[in-house]
Amino acid sequence: IVGTGKSRHPQCVAISGEDGVGKSALLDKAKQMVRGYQMIPLYAACYREESEFFLRPWNDIFWEVEQCVENGLLERSITKEEQAQLDRFFKGSILGDEKPLGRLTYQLMEKAILDMFRKIAEKHKVVLFFDDIQWMDTMSFQLLNRILLTLGTERILLMCTYNQNNDVEVMESLEKLMKKDYLHVISLNPF
């Protein structure tokens, strides 16, 4: 995570490997280490069963942000009204309210989320942890790319795991980060 790319900026890390090789354990260890560096770790696991639900992993991320606010680690970076709006949005998409997201709805939500992370990043470094990112939905990948490409990797980083069998799909979803030299891939192999 603290390594730098050719452009001398911090790089995000994707950990690839087969099932049972230790990707999640390495991710957990990195999450513990991040806390020691006074960074804010935000974690979500992606599941095959939930891969069709729009923005499902982000619900966990926002829950963790709320926990950090309640525990005094973060100042409230969005208004209670914006939080209520995001809550309604996520509850609707998670409870299977299958109405397609309107373009305007998504843009408003994306803007609120970018503003939230921008405000958090003014005072804190944040690391987004996603386990089994191969199960992340397209819209979640879109939002992740947007956050990292808009705000850069100086204050917000990504660390994720994925099954090597899904390498092509994951790399296509993170292609923009690769092109900017924002992502370093580590392959774990069994002994």
Could you say what each language-model-derived stretch is?
Residues 1-191:
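Key residue(s) within conserved catalytic/signature motifs
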